[in-house]
Design a protein with these regions (language model features):
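Active-site histidine-anchored catalytic micro-motif
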Residues: 1-298
Length: 298
């Protein structure tokens, strides 16, 4: 029988309505698992947070729990997680974990007290995947709604996740084992009609060593943003260009996008801002060649 460790962090999968109808994480891992808990599954109730309230330090706590489980000989680890930031946690773990035991993140679109709650099915699927010999060596996976997805390029949709499905093997974009808390600050700055450089300048003044632009269209921004990017890139800040458009590639094909690239910004062709930030954090934290990392994995 496979040994699987389930680490709970909260999220919709564990949430129920309180007496005011407000949804809050309240169910334990044992309650979520039901009979499944008697089948070689160990539960670690780490925290009970809405994933919008998770911090960078929580990534280190999750990583430590994974390391301890792997060192203890577990066959796989499941992380229950809120869907708001699951794509960010999954990618950070993917970039910084190189163990053979699979790490599977799952959650739910509906609360634990909903009559048609999807959490129990998602959790059962995730436990089965984590304990499967076929998942050995695949690294970090997202198991949700009957699909198995690679973290890189996955993003939240209205009732689940959109991303590359894992059929057999997948490349693992491991950059190095590092502490999230020790990683350089990387911020996301939104671009919009008439945007100036105030937000970008403020992020750099606050200590950001990297900034992801949530650019317009295929990767465009106004002149004031372009001028600020040129200043900050010249001063050693890494700027990457993503987009606010849900789908499609980013490219320096229009004049403003080319101006950003000429100013020193890196074009993040595939990743949306939340994951672009995570990739930039990991690249800077591991002292990897950022341009090469973005070109290969961005």
């Amino acid at each position: 029988m496979s040994r699987v460790v389930v680490v709970t962090t909260g999220g919709t999968i564990a949430s129920v309505a309180d007496d005011r109808g407000v949804l809050r994480p309240a169910r334990t891992g044992a309650e979520l698992l039901g009979d499944e808990g008697d089948r070689g599954v160990q539960v670690i109730d780490m925290m009970a947070k809405d994933s919008s309230q998770l911090t960078i330090a929580d990534w280190d706590r999750i990583a430590s729990a994974i390391s301890a489980a792997v060192e203890d000989g577990t066959d796989g680890v499941v992380i229950t997680h809120g869907t708001d930031t699951l794509e960010e946690t999954a990618l950070w773990l993917e970039l910084t974990y190189d163990g053979a035991a699979p790490v599977v993140l799952t959650g739910a679109a509906k609360t634990a007290d909903a009559p048609d709650a999807d959490g129990p099915t998602n959790l059962r699927d995730a436990v089965a995947l984590a304990g499967s010999a076929d998942a050995q060596g695949l690294g970090v996976l997202i198991c949700f709604g009957g699909a198995v997805l690679a973290p890189l390029g996955t993003h939240k949709g209205s009732a689940g996740f959109n991303g590359p499905e894992v059929v057999d093997r997948k490349e693992r974009p491991f950059l190095g084992t590092v502490s999230a808390v020790a990683a350089p600050r990387v911020d996301v700055v939104a671009c919009y009609l008439g945007a100036d450089a105030v937000a970008l300048d403020a992020c750099v003044a606050a200590g950001a060593r990297g900034v992801v632009l949530e650019a317009l269209g295929a990767g465009n921004a106004g002149d004031l943003i372009v001028e600020a990017v040129q200043r900050h890139c010249a001063a050693g800040v890494t700027v990457a260009v993503s987009t606010r458009v849900p789908n499609g590639r980013v490219a320096a094909s229009y004049g403003p996008g080319r101006a950003l690239a000429d100013a020193g910004a890196l074009v993040m062709p595939r990743l949306r801002p939340p994951q672009a930030r995570v990739l930039l954090m990991a690249a800077l934290a591991t002292c990897s060649p950022v341009g090469e990392v973005v070109a290969r994995w961005g």
